[in-house]
Regions:
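Active-site-adjacent structural patch at catalytic or cofactor/ligand-binding sites
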Residues: 50, 60-69, 76-87
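Secondary-structure transition/turn motif
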Residues: 49-53, 147-149
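Beta-strand-connecting loop/turn residues
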Residues: 43-44, 62, 139
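Surface-exposed connector loops and short turns at secondary-structure junctions
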Residues: 55-59
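Charged, gly/pro-rich active-site loop segments
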Residues: 2, 76-182
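Residue-level preference for beta-strand/loop junctions
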Residues: 17, 30-32, 60, 78, ...
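Short beta-strand segments
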Residues: 18-50, 66-67
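Extreme N-terminal tail/first-helix region
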Residues: 1-17, 155, 161
Length: 182
C-alpha cells in the first residue's frame, strides 16, 4: 500500500463532497467522539444538533477536530482530519442570516437533521429538541490517500547467475570448449 499526503486544494475538494464525519471534542483530559452530518462552505463546516453532551463540551472548549473518510478497501481509502474552532449560531436576530445560510446548505441533503431530531431518552428523561446550528472554522487540515502498490510484471529475463551445469554459462562454454555433456 502507498500512502500519499493530499494537497490543501485536494483536501478541500474532497471535503466538499463528504457529508458524514466524526467530531472529536474534549472536556478536561477526556475526549469524546460522535458522528455528525456536515456541509463544507467557504472555510467552515456547518452542522445541526440539539442540546447534548457534544454541544455542552464544545461550548466549554471550542477547539475541535472532525475526521471524515471514504473507504474502498483496506488498501484504498482517503482520510481527512480538520482542526478548527466551534462557533454556535444562536437563535437571535443578528444571527438569522448565518442560521438561514446553515439551513440552506444543510437542507440539500435528505438526512441533514438526523440524528439530532431523533427522540432521545437519557436517564429516563426525554431530551428537549431545541435546534442548534453551528459552524466549525477550519484552521488547518491534513489529508491522506492510500492506494494499492502497483504490481510489477513478472521478470522474464534470463538470470545472470549460473545455476550449475545446465545454466547459461555452461551452455555457452560447451560449444566453445568442444565438450559435450554425456
Amino acid at each position: 500500500m502507498l500512502i500519499q499526503e493530499l494537497s490543501r486544494q485536494a483536501s478541500l475538494d474532497l471535503l466538499a463532497r463528504m457529508r458524514l464525519g466524526r467530531l472529536a471534542c474534549a472536556q478536561g483530559a477526556q475526549p469524546y467522539v460522535t458522528p455528525i452530518y456536515f456541509v463544507s462552505h467557504l472555510g467552515c463546516l456547518y452542522g445541526f444538533s440539539t442540546l447534548g453532551q457534544k454541544i455542552q463540551w464544545m461550548r466549554a472548549n471550542p477547539l475541535v477536530c472532525v475526521e471524515a473518510d471514504e473507504l474502498v478497501s483496506a488498501q484504498e481509502w482517503v482520510s481527512l482530519v480538520v482542526f478548527g474552532r466551534y462557533e454556535e449560531l444562536p437563535d437571535l436576530p443578528e444571527w438569522q442570516g448565518l442560521r438561514a445560510l446553515a439551513h440552506q446548505l444543510l437542507k440539500q441533503y435528505a438526512v441533514w437533521w438526523e440524528p439530532a431530531y431523533a427522540k432521545t431518552i437519557l436517564h429516563g428523561t426525554e431530551r428537549p429538541l431545541v435546534p442548534i446550528f453551528y459552524r466549525i472554522h477550519i484552521h488547518r487540515m491534513t489529508g491522506h490517500r492510500a492506494t494499492p502498490e502497483p504490481v510489477s510484471p513478472p521478470d522474464t529475463r534470463v538470470p545472470m547467475t549460473d545455476p550449475g551445469e545446465t545454466g547459461w554459462l555452461q551452455r555457452f562454454l560447451r560449444p566453445v570448449r568442444g565438450t559435450r555433456k554425456q
